[in-house]
């Protein structure tokens, strides 16, 4: 299972930001509906709420979601690509960013080149879904949707997962709402202390069978 969790890193071709030192990774504006919503509600993401979320597309069709890790790098699931980028027509692979819907044809596109258990304040999953009223295969009419989940303890998680490593956390929808159990792996080690975190957001890997739809993030 560990091998399936290995991420695929895609390099972005283009100009880096002029002043990257002024950009604080993991920070975004506060949104009023991020803390009090019931766990089972799915809502369209507001503009700027998930600035790290992108759409990886093949021949202008949505392939998989991804998260910006760096101004040159995007993280996505390796199983989204049945072949390596060396075997693919790379010119047809693009990353769409800066939008929450695909109906905007002016969205920015970038060409792709070849120990101690921590409790998070919030845990959200984001998914690209087809807009109501459109065909599910119409990839130009999709929007970003979010779902809040709750973290469960390692002891409870271990009852469901046989090979639960120390760098994994588990979360699921609120009990009684037909929630799906998730296993998440942080993309980087947790910070040393809560005081240094503030309101940073961290990207998590999704357990393989679910990761084609959802990209998770947590806020401390």
Curated annotation (Swiss-Prot):
Signal peptide interval: 1-16
GO terms for biological process, alphabetical: proteolysis
Keywords linked to the UniProt accession: Disulfide bond, Glycoprotein, Secreted, Signal
GO cellular component, one term: extracellular region
InterPro entries cross-referenced by the UniProt entry: Peptidase_S1_PA, Peptidase_S1_PA_chymotrypsin, Trypsin_dom, TRYPSIN_HIS
Cysteine disulfide partners in this protein: 64-80, 157-170
GO molecular function: serine-type endopeptidase activity
Gene3D superfamilies on file: Trypsin-like serine proteases (2.40.10.10)
Segments forming domain Peptidase S1: 23-220
Subcellular localization, as worded in the UniProt entry: Secreted
Pfam families (UniProt xref): Trypsin (PF00089)
Nucleotide-binding recorded as keyword: no
Keyword Disulfide bond: yes
Family from the record: Belongs to the peptidase S1 family.
Record protein name field: Serine protease-like protein 51
Native source organism of the sequence: Homo sapiens
Phylogenetic classification of the source organism: Eukaryota, Metazoa, Chordata, Craniata, Vertebrata
């Amino acid at each position: 299972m560990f091998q399936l969790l290995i991420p695929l890193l895609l390099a972005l071709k283009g100009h880096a930001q002029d002043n990257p030192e002024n950009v604080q990774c993991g920070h975004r504006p506060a949104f009023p509906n991020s803390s009090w919503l019931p766990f089972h509600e799915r809502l369209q993401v507001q503009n700027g709420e998930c600035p790290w979320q992108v759409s990886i597309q093949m021949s202008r069709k949505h392939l998989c979601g991804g998260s910006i890790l760096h101004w040159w790098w995007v993280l996505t699931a390796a199983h989204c690509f049945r072949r390596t980028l060396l075997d693919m027509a790379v010119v047809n692979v693009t990353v769409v960013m800066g939008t929450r819907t695909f109906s905007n044809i002016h969205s920015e596109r970038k060409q792709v080149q070849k120990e101690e258990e921590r409790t998070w304040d919030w845990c959200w999953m984001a998914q690209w879904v087809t807009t109501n009223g459109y065909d599910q295969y119409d990839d130009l009419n999709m929007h970003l949707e979010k779902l809040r989940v709750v973290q469960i303890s390692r002891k409870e998680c271990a009852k469901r997962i046989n090979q639960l490593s120390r760098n994994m956390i588990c979360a699921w929808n609120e009990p009684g709402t037909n929630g799906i159990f998730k296993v998440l792996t942080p993309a980087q080690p947790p910070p040393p202390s809560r005081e240094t975190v503030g309101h940073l957001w961290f990207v998590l890997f999704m357990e393989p069978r679910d990761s084609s739809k959802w990209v998770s993030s947590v806020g401390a």
